[in-house]
Amino acid sequence: MDTNSTQAEEKIEYVIKADGHKEKRDDSKIQKMADFATEGTNCSSLELQSSLHFSIRDGIKTSFIHAQMRMEAINKISPDQPQWRIVAGRLQTMEDLKRKRKMARTSKQPFDTGADGELNFDKFIHHQITNGHYDAAYFQLKDSHLVELFEMIAAPKKQRNFDYAVESVITLENKFLIGLETPLHLYFVLSLIFAQKYFSTRDQSIYLKKMSGFDNDVLSQAFIDKVQDYFEKASKKQISFPSVILSELRKPNANLSSCFIGKFPDDMDGIMDLVKEFAIISKKGGGIGANLDSIRAFQSWLMGIKGKATGVVPLMKVLNDLMIYVNQSGVKDGAMTTSLSAWHMDVFNFLKTQQLGGEEREKSMDLYLQLVANDEFMRAMERDGDWYLFDPYEILNKFGIDLGKLFGEEFEEAYAFLIEKTKSTSNDPEGFVELYKKVRAKDLFKESLRTSINRGTPYWAFKDNINNVSNMKNAGTIYGLNLCVESFSPFDVDSTHTCTLLSVVHPFINSDEELRDVTRTAIEILDLTVELSTAPTESSRKHNNEIRAVGLGSMGLADWNAANSLSFEMPDHQDAIQARFEKLAYYAVERSNELGEELGNFGKFEESQWKQGEIFGKVLTEIKMESKTDLDWDTLSHKVSKNMRHGYLMAIAPNTTSSSAIGVSSSILPTISKLFIEETKTG
């Protein structure tokens, strides 16, 4: 034994507690904390305790001992010992819980914790409502019922608060947990709200008298089961909510949709209305796509005078500064992609907004550029041919052609017609094109590469393919993509694409039966989210009614692959992954079909390819040819021709923030490093 170390320990007699009073040092408390933090991991409690010896001194604050133990755990994280992340997460959670208990005792309406140190749930709810964190409208159950539900469903699972790695704890605390919440509170409250909405969208009398227990002294078993089902899947991390739901649901007038795409008209009132709409959407937590195809080109006509229009660049500057000013509920920076078609006369100016050099006031460095190309452009590239750029204002007013609305053969015919009109003269009774440019298609592509080298964008949206594979191609045009390129459906000036997201977390879902169960619940929750969400604008509300777009995504695929010894590269492994996602799609369509039969189809169902029995833009023979499973696609195709609740159903989002909160790999992305550090503005 080291006698010097022993003598040093004997000199340390007191520690200072959080309230300032001295207490004799008790090493058993340090041991107990280390034992708890390392329990069930391959990390050593003794190693954690011994690393504190040089940090402890006489008169040290107990809070410092706790913080130092957490830092020691963080310092031990390595590719060979990743479970120190869990140890550090538990220690961080213990600190957070202690801080929140103190907040409860010192709030304007102080309340004590229970005998086990947990917050009294009824007083917790009242505190959250009083302090503006929760909307009281969500908590109409009697206090006794709320406590009964919590004690029955969530309280026995309080250990799940300690199932998060340190990066997940920090993400949850900095971005999503409100007031005195713990992860357990968060998932229970969300589950309660979803369950209440589930029954309120069905028979109201059943909801009030038989199911919810609002008018009874006993909660119905059906209601309890529904809350428990949602809570179990959320708290076991089998489903992952997007940032906007984690941060907004339980607040008044919450927008719960993540993705929006709007189209600018070519008039001042409409332009400024959409700018305001985008500000509201960003404030409410949405990521935005903005299509600029209809904006008249630089030097087009303005009030009848040719050469006076300023084009898309000044509008982009307005949008750029708007995203800096209006963030996403304080959780994220404002985020927008601006899309422009490759035939637009301003396309080169559009690209130069993110190139180095030039006028600073023409730069829009905080936007994400998106170029929209028809197949005709790619053909011009292949043959090293010319490419014509047009002003949308001129061709609409002279020829009645809205070029942005067209795709496929209709676009090709209109485009060829306009090229011929560039060769006409003023004597042509049909008119002629005055404002146009002729460039090499490859020169435009090279210009996009110059911008991409500087900024990483633009990304390309291939318009013909996007619209041709859409199940909604007869219901309107998809002019461009959303910010993260996973969600897009027909939209227009008066109908802003609006989509609600949620992901299944593959590494926590084992069997096919479990995958089906989780997927069905996920689609159910997505549908309830549309009902619960307060659409930020009227055009968003219209799109919800017409298409009812939701996006079921995936998370943690790399972790699931590793757990099942699968590689992204080997063909037979790819078949296994493909089968997994085919099942996911089948179960999602199956549940949406059932909800459509029960609650009604989305507004434009009759105009959609679902009505023809097509699934995700594919006919039955094509689906069966590509199938890697024995699922009954024949029966499902017949069913969807009669009912579908959602016009848009699946969307694999990047979900980097929410995957950090769960503690799994992002989306379907491979893991490229055993250990990495991600820094954000909030930690």
Per-range role (PLM):
Residues 1-683:
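Extended catalytic cores of very large enzyme megasubunits
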